[in-house]
């Protein structure tokens, strides 16, 4: 299997540490006045999203992780797993609720998602940065009710709850940032 030397480290590189697939979040090369140079690296575990910091001596090598990212389309829920299909090969990937994580609240039929595979098995799903969803329930905004600028909670068609401005009504379609779970704008038809 391929390996990377410390001088090849950069953000986004996927490596295998203690049998766990990790992605390099941050890499800092340190050359102390005395002693050997080293790399201080922040790594994010792809299985559980934990971030750890490790140091590697200059010239040390790390095994490359067998991690693959595929663009897929969400098809349906199968009772105990979520089914995603590759749009060209029609290959289906069964994803557990555990691997789905926070992305579950943004799932919409026929939308595209990134499936992360480790050794051929799906380990996580990444939603698009922005999704358009319909508001199925929110309190009506009262005219002149502008004392609080925090907005009001709105339940979306996927079951997610986000805070929206007072002028947004039930039945409207809004754009939501999936990374922060925040309202971005109304979507014009």
Curated annotation (Swiss-Prot):
Pathway: Protein biosynthesis; polypeptide chain elongation. PROSITE patterns: EFP. InterPro entries: Elong-fact-P_C, NA-bd_OB-fold, Rib_uL2_dom2, Transl_elong_fac_P/YeiP, Transl_elong_KOW-like, Transl_elong_P/YeiP_cen, Transl_elong_P/YeiP_CS, Transl_elongation_fac_P. One of its GO terms (cellular component) is cytoplasm. One of its GO terms (molecular function) is translation elongation factor activity. It is found in: Cytoplasm. The keyword Cytoplasm applies. It holds the Pfam family EFP_N. Involved in peptide bond synthesis. Alleviates ribosome stalling that occurs when 3 or more consecutive Pro residues or the sequence PPG is present in a protein, possibly by augmenting the peptidyl transferase activity of the ribosome. Modification of Lys-34 is required for alleviation. May be beta-lysylated on the epsilon-amino group of Lys-34 by the combined action of EpmA and EpmB, and then hydroxylated on the C5 position of the same residue by EpmC (if this protein is present). Lysylation is critical for the stimulatory effect of EF-P on peptide-bond formation. The lysylation moiety may extend toward the peptidyltransferase center and stabilize the terminal 3-CCA end of the tRNA. Hydroxylation of the C5 position on Lys-34 may allow additional potential stabilizing hydrogen-bond interactions with the P-tRNA. HAMAP family: EF_P. SMART domains: EFP, Elong-fact-P_C. It comes from the Bacteria. The lineage of its organism: Bacteria, Pseudomonadati, Pseudomonadota, Gammaproteobacteria, Thiotrichales. Keywords: Cytoplasm, Elongation factor, Hydroxylation, Protein biosynthesis. The modification N6-(3,6-diaminohexanoyl)-5-hydroxylysine is found at residue 34. This is Elongation factor P. It comes from Francisella tularensis subsp. holarctica (strain LVS).
């Amino acid at each position: 299997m391929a390996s990377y030397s410390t001088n090849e480290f950069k953000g986004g590189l996927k490596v295998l540490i203690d049998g766990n697939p990790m992605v390099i979040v941050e890499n800092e090369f340190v050359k102390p006045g005395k002693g050997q140079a080293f790399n201080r690296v922040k790594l994010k575990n792809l299985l559980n999203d934990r971030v750890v910091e490790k140091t590697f001596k200059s010239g040390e090598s790390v095994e490359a992780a067998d991690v693959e990212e595929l663009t897929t389309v969400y098809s349906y829920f199968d009772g105990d797993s979520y089914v995603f299909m590759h749009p060209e090969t029609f290959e289906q990937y069964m994803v557990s609720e555990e691997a789905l994580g926070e992305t579950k609240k943004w799932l919409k039929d026929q939308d595209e998602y990134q499936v992360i595979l480790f050794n051929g098995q799906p380990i996580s799903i990444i939603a698009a940065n922005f999704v358009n969803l319909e508001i199925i329930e929110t309190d009506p905004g009262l005219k002149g009710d502008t004392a609080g600028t925090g907005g009001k909670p709105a339940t979306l068609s996927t079951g997610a709850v986000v805070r929206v401005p007072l002028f947004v009504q039930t039945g409207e379609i809004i754009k939501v940032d999936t990374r922060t779970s925040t309202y971005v704008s109304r979507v014009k038809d």
